[in-house]
A protein has these predicted regions:
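Membrane-proximal, solvent-exposed terminal domains/tails of membrane-associated proteins
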Residues: 49, 101-200
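Mid-length scaffold segments of soluble, non-membrane domains
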Residues: 86-109
Length: 200
């Protein structure tokens, strides 16, 4: 006998089981449109209520799909935990870990510009932007597995964009570098994002 779909949904939404997921997409990119696009999307969010955050999540997933030709690296992890308190702690740890990289890389790049006399033009042939999506959802199992290919990443982003809104409990969007005038170098990718894998 199969459980009614609504009954399963209600169990997932009311129990203490939470899935915390991180999806990172690295883009080898010459233009600055994706950073400007992300800034624009965030500016449209008037508050941190879940409806607006869910809309932001859908829009970011769609934007990343639009830039699929620039995908270079990916990292995916989705972990289910047995309590909301543990999930919140894990989510905050992941967020802090990623946001710490923003300050570090911005400082390093500023020092490099200073040594060069400032105003230098980046060689964009091997520069990157990394976009990180952190999600806390009411799912009772991981929402995706490991991702190594562009096709799997595309499917995952499409699934995220079609997620049921009531399942979203937390969402954090982080991209590095924050400014459209800055990019990550090969060295930055190796140092700070060495666990990401090249997309096959």
């Amino acid at each position: 006998m199969y459980q009614d779909v609504n009954e399963v949904d209600n169990q997932e939404l009311t129990n203490d089981i939470v899935t915390v997921s991180k999806l990172q997409v690295g883009l080898r990119i010459r233009a600055d449109q994706i950073q400007e696009g992300l800034i624009h999307l965030v500016e449209q969010v008037g508050s941190n209520n879940m409806d607006e955050l869910f809309t932001l999540l859908q829009q970011v997933a769609s934007l990343l799909l639009d830039y699929s030709t620039f995908w270079s690296h990916v990292l995916a992890s989705s972990q289910t935990v047995g309590s909301r308190q543990v999930a919140e702690t894990l989510f905050n740890q992941l967020s802090l870990q990623e946001r710490t990289k923003l300050t570090k890389d911005a400082l390093v790049h500023a020092m490099q510009d200073g040594r060069k006399g400032g105003g230098g033009v980046l060689d964009n042939s091997n520069t990157y932007v990394v976009v990180t999506l952190l999600l806390g959802t009411a799912d009772d199992q991981p929402i995706f597995g490991e991702i190594y290919s562009g096709s799997l990443l595309r499917d995952t982003l499409q699934d995220i964009s079609m997620m049921r809104s009531r399942y979203l409990m937390a969402f954090d969007l982080i991209w590095n570098p924050q400014l459209s005038t800055d990019k990550l170098t090969e060295t930055d990718m190796t140092t700070d994002y060495g666990d990401m894998v090249a997309i096959a």
